[in-house]
């Protein structure tokens, strides 16, 4: 793994001022929330993520995606973890989510030392934060104190998650509904610098000809990259196959994603849309040329995402098991 990025002094000062402004509107969240009640909580989560990543380098991408799907559906309340026939986890839109065992391992480790103290919602947020660091990305400080949601409904999933064939306008609307800006959209899309996707998530960019062979129908794709994708996904077992989101540095959290967009190698239609539209192209080009800028902006946007729809106090609970309400 690449070594973790360290923020310089001026960037750190800027970030601290930014975080302070956010916390004024979420007074129940704070840094080191568990300092007195469970001082080892963040260490245990980080250690669990690092251990899991060392044996399975796909873990960081899975944890990031799990976090996005949790926050976008009902706020960052760990409702995506609840098992049941009609919960978020059971919805087809969440069928390919992973990383659940990492969350459970961290929760069990914490419960052994600090029973009924640390929320699953905080564990999911911290695990996603630590996943980025484990993959070589920036170290981000996030506030904690979230409570776990008490309900989880499959019906809430499809209206809230972003499909890979969304237009830019649809993505902007989705992010805006969560209090996130167009800059947050471009920056958080950088999560696609790690992780993988099943073929059916992007096969709408191709069609089969009269002989049953794939042909490109999305002119925004680089020809050689499109050929690679079609070859990978042409077999009858393509529904179970996965392709790296980033064809260049798939296990490293860096700004390669944006450089891929410049060469028309975005895996999803939603990726390519960022480079094709004047409203976002300049940001893509800036982040492609300056990894430090990407890491700074990632830190800011990630914290904003982690505070979407959080539950605090009596609005939530501390689950004993992340997969079921108390």
Swiss-Prot record:
Superkingdom of this protein's organism: Eukaryota
Residues with site note (Transition state stabilizer): 65
Catalytic activity: 2 a phenolic donor + H2O2 = 2 a phenolic radical donor + 2 H2O
Entries under Gene3D superfamilies matching the protein: 1.10.520.10, Peroxidase, domain 2
Predominant location category: secreted
InterPro entries: Haem_peroxidase, Haem_peroxidase_sf, Peroxidase_pln, Peroxidases_heam-ligand_BS, Secretory_peroxidase
Disulfide bonds: 38-114, 71-76, 120-322, 199-233
SUPFAM superfamilies: Heme-dependent peroxidases
The name this protein goes by in its record: Peroxidase 46
Organism: Arabidopsis thaliana
Gene, per the UniProt record: PER46
